[in-house]
């Protein structure tokens, strides 16, 4: 089984880094295929905690080749900040591969992202302000800068000039900001050329050959299904395809090479930024989930919105992605609750919806219909099998599996790599 795709099933921050890292020692390549440094993941190895934003979490596993695919937008300054920080802590980053076709976040992309959000005011999307959306917009408008362009200064300058002809007019006339210098932008981008040269390659070809050798390739999705540009809660979404299909376009592999699709889902729900969230808790219960779960953004540090588990979203994710296995994370965060609600359907203006409403307006007005499950008080962080879990925790996991659309193959009971209950082999 050479290819496995790993995605988030909710609105991100599900613990994909932990799931990727748990698989990492058994795979040969870990490929990031979408997004940029707008999504962070934290991996705990022993007493060491690593916060990654752009690098694939497989970079922490010796022997694994980490890959950044063509579907990623790359802030080169952030890339080398992460590489240098990991190198200083003894992590070998020399095997990293970077697609020549990946698009580059230029300084003006960050500026435009930030001023646009401020300009929108109450209508803002809630971006991280890191230039992700503007870079993808340039890609679609065919005026983007790719990694390979850094190796031809004349082409690079031509592209920067063409982009800034339009963007400086916008900055000056609409946003009342100063113009961005072509020379400074070109100089900034060229400063990274020598450092990226050893890692730049044809990622699609590299991965095709690896799969032909029956090596195991793990495709690691950024963000999550409900933030997908096409299938998420538009317009409150990211700018890339964060569903399993994005692995094919974002890394250059055909769909028939993918053998298994794993979706990571929290035992409750969180969201960062604007947009609908039917099970959101705006009271003391929501704050307790936030504090107990450490729900503060890896990238931004801002508090995450919290709510109960939403099986409607899980079923949707299972269908959209073709999920073969779920990994349930942060079950330990629910320890101590007397009763745990689970959303099994929505009420929209008196009508029951077992699936996500088609219209944005209906989704905004959706009210959760809950079933309730008995909680537990026992410490579960030492559990390594289902039998180690309290009966009520076992019943909760089994209930989520029954209503979520696919089997739950692993359960996270703590932040460490070893704190996982494995029910089914994800690679078997």
Curated annotation (Swiss-Prot):
Keywords tagged on the record: Cytoplasm, GTP-binding, Ligase, Magnesium, Metal-binding, Nucleotide-binding, Purine biosynthesis
Pfam families: Adenylsucc_synt (PF00709)
Residues the entry annotates as binding Mg(2+): 13, 40
Cofactor note: Binds 1 Mg(2+) ion per subunit.
Record has Metal-binding as a keyword: yes
Swiss-Prot/TrEMBL cofactor(s): Mg(2+)
Cytoplasm as UniProt keyword: yes
Catalysis: reaction(s): IMP + L-aspartate + GTP = N(6)-(1,2-dicarboxyethyl)-AMP + GDP + phosphate + 2 H(+)
One cellular-component annotation, GO: cytoplasm
Gene Ontology molecular functions: adenylosuccinate synthase activity; GTP binding; magnesium ion binding
Localisation: Cytoplasm
Residue stretches in coiled coil: none
Residues bound to GTP: 12-18, 40-42, 304, 330-332, 412-414
EC numbers for this chain: 6.3.4.4
Gene3D superfamilies with a match to the protein in the record: Adenylosuccinate Synthetase, subunit A, domain 1 (3.40.440.10), Adenylosuccinate Synthetase, subunit A, domain 2 (1.10.300.10), Adenylosuccinate Synthetase, subunit A, domain 3 (3.90.170.10)
Sequence similarity: Belongs to the adenylosuccinate synthetase family.
Protein name (Swiss-Prot/TrEMBL): Adenylosuccinate synthetase
Organism encoding this protein: Kineococcus radiotolerans (strain ATCC BAA-149 / DSM 14245 / SRS30216)
